[in-house]
């Protein structure tokens, strides 16, 4: 009987520590699978200048929000702004995946607002005279909420709020790569590369 008691204690102790170790490993695995915190991506990321009157993409990430801006410049050096459209999202990271041999974080975004901004006097005049997007009080450098609107003057249809979209993010140093938000699910490729300011 004296032999069995220490043996029972040893077995119980072994099972206890094995269980604790397993729980710690599970917690570590779950934390890794959850993906990087959004805050690790915070910053403004600029796409390559597309030239005069072409669309240059900018992404701004701040904790639980992300904004995708399509900026049009009037000069080839992309220094003089003409107009821009911005799609705003609330975002959460869901899990990790390997895409293009890189460990990416999967992002689920929910649309909040779509904004349109005009930066030149002549374009403001045209917008007000033509009531672009049904709006006739455009002001230079001031964003207008165009969420859910169809703007035939601009050949643009802006999405409604509350729409789920998906993206994948990768950050290495000052290089940010992503696929762009879309409602069809997570992309299997990193299609765009931007540089952090």
Q: Where are the predicted features?
A:
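Bacterial Sec-dependent N-terminal signal peptides
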Residues: 2, 13-42, 190-192, 196-197
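Sec-dependent N-terminal signal peptides
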Residues: 6-11
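A generic structural signal for short, solvent-exposed coil/turn residues
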Residues: 12, 37, 58-60, 83, ...
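Compositionally biased, low-structure terminal segments
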Residues: 17-18, 42, 46, 177, ...
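Acidic/polar, low-complexity intrinsically disordered N-terminal segments immediately downstream
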Residues: 23-67
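Contiguous, well-ordered beta-strand patches that form the walls/edges
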Residues: 51-52, 71-173, 182-188, 196
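Short, solvent-exposed coil/turn segments at beta-strand boundaries
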Residues: 58-67, 168-177, 197
């Amino acid at each position: 009987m004296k032999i069995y008691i220490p043996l029972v204690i040893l077995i119980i102790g072994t099972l206890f520590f094995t269980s604790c170790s397993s729980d710690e490993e599970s917690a570590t695995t779950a934390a890794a699978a959850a993906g990087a915190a959004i805050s690790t991506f915070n910053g403004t990321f600029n796409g390559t200048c597309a030239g005069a009157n072409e669309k240059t993409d900018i992404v701004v990430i701040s904790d639980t929000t992300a904004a995708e801006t399509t900026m049009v410049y009037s000069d080839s050096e992309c220094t003089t702004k003409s107009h821009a459209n911005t799609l705003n999202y609330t975002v959460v990271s869901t899990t990790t995946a390997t895409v293009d041999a890189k460990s990416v974080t999967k992002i689920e975004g929910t649309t909040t607002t779509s904004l349109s901004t005009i930066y030149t006097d002549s374009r403001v005049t045209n917008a007000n005279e033509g009531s672009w997007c049904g709006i006739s009080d455009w002001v230079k450098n001031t964003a207008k909420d165009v969420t859910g609107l169809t703007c035939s003057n601009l050949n643009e249809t802006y999405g409604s709020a509350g729409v789920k979209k998906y993206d994948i993010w990768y950050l290495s140093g000052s290089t940010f790569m992503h696929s762009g938000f879309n409602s069809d699910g997570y992309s299997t490729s990193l299609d765009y590369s931007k540089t952090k300011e």
